[in-house]
């Protein structure tokens, strides 16, 4: 029995550990360190219809407990991803989750329609929550009606299940999650980065050229846990949880909150082996906590009927 196997819409995962989009590129750099086939899946870098060069530099700043980034969805564009990056990933035994972005709804629809045809793309992740772009991005993720409409339009053209990435920079994340579920989403991924800023002590100006950036890393984990806990009780579609995950213990905490799988982001920059390390350590942690299978942990913080052996 594979104690870590997880079944989600469109995704049969040998384990629930997925490198998060934007922190793993298309996997080429990390493939120099280990066989990517050990992973549950990969959320590839956001893809837009046309190439994007991203925001001006500097666009990364360290903070206590994390980092700020304002990359601006830099990517080689749909054609390059379809003709080069996705074919390269076919050598690995794992389903790919393609992250889809755009400036307007038509962009999302165009990318989703084409990229969902790739043989190794088993699901889409709609990036409606990036805080670092002037148009699109978070603009789609802060209004329930707009988020639902975009979800519905993408579902109509996608050949694979659609997951929607939620922004924490909202007043009521549950309301948005329910609207997206009602529009036909197959799952949710959450949370994206929190909007933040750092100032230079000598100039008193923002360190990032974009002024603001997305905060990620351990600092945001309590926020992510709280939001997963709230949303998982309000919807009936699976959640891939993310936000500050660094250890096997972090993974279990997200499962307790209600996640069915997790994505590891910023920690990949600190330790390129973090994902395989977590995968290796999870079975012993399940033994320690008294669980036969990781699915027994899902929603344990609020499911009264969930008990360890």
Swiss-Prot record:
Identify the metabolic or biological route this protein is part of. Answer: Pyrimidine metabolism; UMP biosynthesis via de novo pathway; orotate from (S)-dihydroorotate (NAD(+) route): step 1/1
Could you tell me one molecular function GO term of this UniProt entry? Answer: dihydroorotate dehydrogenase (NAD+) activity
| TM segment ranges | none
Q: Does the keyword Oxidoreductase apply?
A: yes
Stored InterPro entries: Aldolase_TIM, DHO_dehydrogenase, DHOD_1B, Dihydroorotate_DH_1, Dihydroorotate_DH_1_2, Dihydroorotate_DH_cat, Dihydroorotate_DH_CS, Dihydroorotate_DH_I
Looking at the UniProt record for this protein, which Gene Ontology cellular component terms does it annotate, in alphabetical order? cytoplasm
Annotated residues that bind FMN are located at 21, 45-46, 99, 127, 165, 191, 217, 243-244, 265-266
Q: Which reaction does it catalyse?
A: (S)-dihydroorotate + NAD(+) = orotate + NADH + H(+)
Q: Name one GO biological process term.
A: 'de novo' UMP biosynthetic process
- Compartments, as annotated in UniProt: Cytoplasm
Q: Which UniProt keywords apply?
A: Cytoplasm, Flavoprotein, FMN, NAD, Oxidoreductase, Pyrimidine biosynthesis
What does the note accompanying the cofactor annotation read? Answer: Binds 1 FMN per subunit.
Q: Which PANTHER family match?
A: DIHYDROOROTATE DEHYDROGENASE (FUMARATE), DIHYDROOROTATE DEHYDROGENASE (QUINONE), MITOCHONDRIAL-RELATED
What's this protein's name?
Dihydroorotate dehydrogenase B (NAD(+)), catalytic subunit
Name of the encoding gene: pyrD
């Amino acid at each position: 029995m594979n104690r870590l196997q997880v079944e989600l819409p469109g995704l049969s995962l040998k384990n629930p550990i997925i490198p998060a989009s934007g922190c793993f590129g298309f996997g080429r750099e990390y493939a120099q360190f280990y066989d990517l086939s050990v992973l549950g899946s990969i959320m590839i870098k956001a893809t837009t219809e046309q190439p994007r060069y991203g925001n001006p530099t500097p666009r990364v700043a360290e903070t206590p407990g994390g980092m700020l980034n304002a990359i601006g969805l830099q990517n080689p564009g749909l054609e390059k991803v379809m003709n080069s990056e996705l074919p390269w990933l076919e050598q690995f035994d794992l389903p790919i989750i393609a992250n889809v972005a755009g400036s307007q709804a038509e962009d999302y629809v165009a990318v989703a329609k084409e990229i969902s045809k790739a043989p190794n793309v088993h699901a889409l992740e709609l990036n409606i929550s990036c805080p670092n772009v002037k148009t699109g991005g978070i603009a789609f993720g802060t209004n329930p009606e707009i988020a639902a409409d975009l979800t519905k339009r993408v579902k109509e053209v996608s050949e694979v299940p659609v997951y929607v990435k939620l922004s924490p920079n909202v007043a009521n994340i549950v309301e948005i999650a329910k609207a997206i579920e009602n529009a036909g989403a197959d799952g949710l991924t959450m949370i994206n980065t929190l909007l933040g800023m750092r100032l230079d002590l000598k100039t008193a100006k923002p360190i990032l050229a974009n002024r603001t950036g997305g905060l990620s890393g351990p600092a945001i984990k309590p926020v992510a846990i709280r939001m997963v806990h709230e949303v998982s009780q309000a919807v009936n579609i699976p959640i891939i949880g993310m936000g500050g995950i660094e250890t096997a213990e972090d993974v279990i905490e997200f499962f307790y909150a209600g996640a069915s799988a997790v994505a590891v982001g910023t920690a990949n920059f600190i330790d390129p082996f973090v994902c395989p390390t977590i995968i290796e350590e999870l079975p012993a942690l399940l033994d320690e906590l008294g669980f036969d299978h990781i699915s027994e942990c899902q929603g344990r913080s609020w499911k009264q009927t969930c008990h360890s052996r």
